[in-house]
């Protein structure tokens, strides 16, 4: 099942999956910054007659400007996608999963969760904390939950935020395939938290101990 707000791109992706891997995909067009969009996906996930074995909450976007420079409705939309949608879709999926005693959820956060990076960082910190609790709470009922915290990854996400790649040290950039491979390896190993690459594991660990002033310099990387 594929979920996004761009129907045309979803159709292209579904066709590609069918052609390349012989996978038939169910497509749901939904804007997860809107409650009615969330409701469409919630209804599908809570339908016990059509069980979903694994949910990956990967919807998200970042805002180009700093907190006070953004319209408050932009901040609210980001919060709805990054936090509210994760909470509601996890809640919807957990009902059927706990009832049958199996299933899994991967919530995509960010290594930014460990750094002072405005409302985006705060949202990802919520996902990380929520995931750590949920993994323990529902693991006893047969449902696995893992939080994925990638760093700078070569996707259109950072381009849309006007992040200058050349301003970020090359060793900090990760390829999508590497992030996916390490995340799936951690999933297979039963880990509740996945931080791809040793360097980002080190950054996450150090971030818990470094002064906020030092972390603030790091969080400005790539900003115009």
Task: Indicate residue ranges for each PLM-predicted region.
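Residue(s) in the substrate-gating loop at a strand-loop-helix junction
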Residues: 110
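Substrate-binding pocket helix/loop in short-chain dehydrogenase/reductase
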Residues: 66-79
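C-terminal helical subdomain
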Residues: 147, 167-203
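Conserved NAD(P)H cofactor-binding loop of Rossmann-fold oxidoreductase domains
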Residues: 58-63
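Active-site helix of classical SDR
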Residues: 90, 123-126
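A short, exposed helix-loop element centered on a Lys and neighboring polar residues
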Residues: 90-91, 132
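Conserved glycine-rich Rossmann-like NAD(P)H-binding loop of the short-chain dehydrogenase/reductase
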Residues: 1-12
